[in-house]
Structure formats: structure tokens, C-alpha cells
Amino acid sequence: MPIQPPSKGTLYIVSAPSGAGKTSLVRALLERVAGIQVSVSHTTRAMRPGEQNGINYHFVDVATFERLIESGDFIEHARVFDNYYGTSRAAVQALLDAGQDVILEIDWQGARQVREAFDEAVSIFILPPSREALHARLAGRGTDDAATIARRMRDAVDEMSHYDEYEHVIINDTFDHALDELSCLVHAQRTRMPRVQAEHAPLLAALLSRVEDVE
């Protein structure tokens, strides 16, 4: 059997309209499945109460962000709700090379850019069960006025119009069921032939070694 290269992690792209429950699903996935983590993005938006720099985001000013764009530091970047967001190329590659699975929580624009750089990335889109449910979730946050909610709904419809650019779609109607589907996708990816051959090369070599004849 040929020697396999070191095992590398899988890159997951997870997108959804605001209010579809993507963040909650990903957080629950991290608690359920080992060996996977979310990439910490850069952003120019203001830090919210309870957030920590380097944990939730790398918070930078616009000038710094634009310098990082010019130097090619980002796999993807986009402007969302009047703020920049971007993903560090070096940070993601280092995690993948170490065999860590990585999740990118990004919008459809960023997803297109990532697929160009990582053609083996697994893309997943989270949809709400209905527009009414999505509106109720956005309004239920209690942090936005009616005009802001209306704008977020328009942006959500635009985001959802790109669902068919993704390999997998999960409808988040019942949270536990959606989480099961997301977990199954990760576990199934870990049983794909190239990864199994890389991670279990010694076992496979031992199983397939020649059995000596018994006199």
C-alpha cells in the first residue's frame, strides 16, 4: 500500500440568513463533536457586550482591514451591514494542516471566494422553516426597530436566493433534528476514503499484510 500524506482536516462553509439559527447550531455542534472549531474572523464592526477580541472576532479598524485585503491575507472578505468581515488564509491553513476540521460562518459572497481557493470545502446552507418563522425570530430578539427588521428580512431573502450554490441544505425547523443532520454530515465526511487512508494507514497496512502460510 502506498504511503499516504499526513491527514488534513476538512473545511466547512456554513451560511444562512440572519435568524435561521446558524450560530446556535454551530455552537451545539462544537459541544457534540470533537476535533472541529470555528475560524475566528476579522471584522470592523464594534465589539458587543460580552465579546472578546481574538475569541469572538479579531476586531480591527477599517484602515487595518483594507491593508490586510491589499496584502492578500484573506481567503474571503465581504461587506455586510456596513461592516467588513474577513477570514485569515494563514490561520485556516494552519488548522487544516494540523488535522483540525474548521468551520467558516460566512455569507454567500464569502462562500464563493472560499470555494475558489479550497475546492474540496464542504458547503452547507441553513434555511428557516418559513418566512413567517424567520420574521418572528428576528423580531423576537427585541434589539431592532421595525425598519431594521424589514431591512434584515430583505437581506435574508437575498441571502436565501443563493441556497442552490451549496452542496447541502438543512432546514432548521426542529433544532435537535437540524443538529443531528449537521452532525451526520461531519461524521460522514470523516469516513471518506482519502481521510480514512491517511488517518489509519498503520492499521490498514497491518490488516492487508501478507498472512504467512502455516505448515
UniProtKB/Swiss-Prot annotation:
Coiled coil: none annotated. The keyword Secreted does not apply. Gene3D superfamilies: Guanylate Kinase phosphate binding domain, P-loop containing nucleotide triphosphate hydrolases. Its main location: cytoplasm. Transmembrane segments: none annotated. Keywords: ATP-binding, Cytoplasm, Kinase, Nucleotide-binding, Transferase. It catalyses: GMP + ATP = GDP + ADP. GO terms for cellular component: cytosol. Residues 9-187 form the Guanylate kinase-like domain. SMART domains: GuKc (SM00072). Its EC number is 2.7.4.8. ATP binds at A16, P17, S18, G19, A20, G21, K22, T23. GO terms for molecular function: ATP binding; guanylate kinase activity. Pfam families: Guanylate_kin. It is found in: Cytoplasm. NCBIfam families: guanyl_kin (TIGR03263). Essential for recycling GMP and indirectly, cGMP. This is Guanylate kinase. It comes from Chromohalobacter salexigens (strain ATCC BAA-138 / DSM 3043 / CIP 106854 / NCIMB 13768 / 1H11). The gene is gmk.
